[in-house]
């Protein structure tokens, strides 16, 4: 990972203007898995109230505060700064907030909160927690840093509904430590704790506990885990619906499918992320020396550049053992597979039938599994749509589904 000096220089160069959330960048790549281990569900976390975070000017370096901060509870806000120059009908805040690692350590996570203009209604505003797709593992890939993001099209429908829009970067993206890519517990905690952060800001956001979770690709995986974890990890939140777009699932199947895929660099990213999250996940058990050397690029560049780097080599040059056949990797593939526990809310799964990254059959198998355990779930597929291309065509139906959940209507289910 880049050293502290490199990280701070990059952040100061990006500055505070032109952020525009970086949300679209988050959609481009598939998600990884997370852990559904007992550690993720047994945490005794509690609600947080309004706090007194450090207030920063737009040109100050918020991320530097993640290097040294006072202990706090999940969701408490460490620092906040208003972001100028973003063309949305609301106020954009960049935040640094407390969350919890898989091991239970207090970690600082960055993200974005967008607050609609005007006064909040009686009872507070509903919250939409957005979980982004794969951007990379390097600090510079954190969406809240991105000056060219064009997420206005995603944000505006929720601002029009007077909802607070929150978007986590996830643990280790923009902040110290390697990002635990595809580690469900870490992703889920970050996704829930930024809702707590919005609530902790009190009248500044007017956020209530009523929450909808939405994510695509890696983010689809993240919100499925957040939904599974919510009742135990964040019981004060009222999660009413979860929308998972093209979520990575059936991880053992996907790991095998990536063997001859141009997206096989996801194997390297996942190996790096799980090695960061799980001390026993020895890289040499799954990666060749060349594959391990290429992880230097994982820590320096973002997803698009990683694809070009890994595509120069054949699978056999990078992978020494099939992760399905060596421990603890085989177990981690299962533990980080979503859909084994009933979540707090009904689930809508969206998938393009021409998805080139996450096989569309995987979400059908996921629905079958979720039905077997009693999870209310509906799956909608879109003919001719790709991994990221499905987002636009599915948006009107998704918004209708969210509106119905917020209105208290019962959700349809594919389960007999």
Regions found by a protein language model. Give the residues of each.
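C-terminal motif of bacterial Sec signal peptides marking the signal peptidase cleavage site
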Residues: 27-31
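Catalytic-loop region of hydrolases
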Residues: 33-120
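Accessory cap/linker subdomain of secreted extracellular hydrolases
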Residues: 51-55, 60, 66-67, 245-339
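Short, surface-exposed "cap/lid" segments of acyl-processing enzymes
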Residues: 102-160
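Primarily recognizes the serine-hydrolase "nucleophile elbow" in alpha/beta-hydrolase
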Residues: 196-265
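C-terminal catalytic histidine-bearing segment of alpha/beta-hydrolase fold enzymes
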Residues: 330-331, 357, 364-416
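Short beta-strand/loop motif that positions the catalytic acidic residue
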Residues: 343, 348-355
């Amino acid at each position: 990972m880049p050293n502290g000096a490199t990280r701070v220089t990059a952040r100061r160069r990006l500055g505070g203007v032109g952020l525009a959330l970086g949300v679209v960048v988050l959609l481009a790549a598939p998600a990884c898995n997370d852990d559904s281990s007992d550690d993720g569900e047994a945490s005794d976390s509690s609600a947080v109230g309004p706090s007194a975070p450090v207030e920063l000017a737009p040109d100050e370096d918020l991320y530097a505060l993640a290097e040294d901060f006072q202990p706090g509870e999940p969701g408490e806000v460490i620092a906040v700064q208003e972001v100028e120059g973003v063309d949305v009908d609301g106020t954009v805040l960049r935040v640094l907030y407390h969350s919890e690692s898989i091991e239970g350590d207090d970690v600082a996570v960055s993200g974005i909160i967008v607050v609609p203009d005007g006064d909040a209604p009686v009872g507070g505003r509903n919250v939409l927690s957005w979980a982004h797709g794969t951007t990379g593992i390097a600090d510079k890939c954190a969406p809240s840093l991105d000056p060219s993001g064009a997420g206005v099209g995603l944000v505006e429908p929720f601002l029009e509904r007077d909802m607070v829009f929150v978007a986590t970067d996830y643990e280790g993206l923009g902040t110290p430590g390697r990002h635990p890519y595809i580690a469900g517990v870490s992703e889920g905690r970050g996704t829930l704790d930024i809702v707590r952060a919005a609530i902790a800001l009190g009248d500044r956001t007017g956020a209530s506990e009523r929450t909808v979770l939405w994510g695509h690709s890696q983010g689809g995986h993240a919100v499925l885990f957040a939904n599974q974890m919510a009742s135990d990890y964040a019981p004060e939140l009222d999660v009413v619906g979860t929308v998972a777009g093209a979520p990575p699932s059936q991880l053992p199947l996907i790991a095998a499918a990536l063997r001859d895929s141009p997206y096989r660099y996801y194997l390297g990213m996942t190996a790096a992320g799980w090695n960061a999250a799980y001390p026993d996940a020895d890289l040499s058990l799954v990666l060749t020396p060349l594959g391990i050397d290429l992880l230097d690029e994982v820590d320096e560049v973002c997803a698009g550049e990683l694809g070009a780097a890994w595509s120069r080599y054949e699978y056999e040059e990078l992978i020494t053992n099939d992760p399905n056949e060596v421990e603890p990797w085989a177990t981690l593939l299962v533990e980080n597979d979503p859909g084994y526990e009933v979540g707090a809310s009904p689930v809508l799964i969206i998938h393009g039938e021409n998805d080139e990254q996450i096989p569309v059959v995987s979400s059908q198998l996921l629905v079958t599994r979720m039905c077997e355990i009693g999870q209310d779930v509906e799956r909608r597929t879109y003919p001719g749509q790709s991994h990221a291309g499905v987002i636009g065509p599915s948006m009107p139906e998704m918004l209708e589904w969210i509106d119905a959940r917020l209105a208290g209507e019962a959700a349809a289910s594919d389960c007999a």
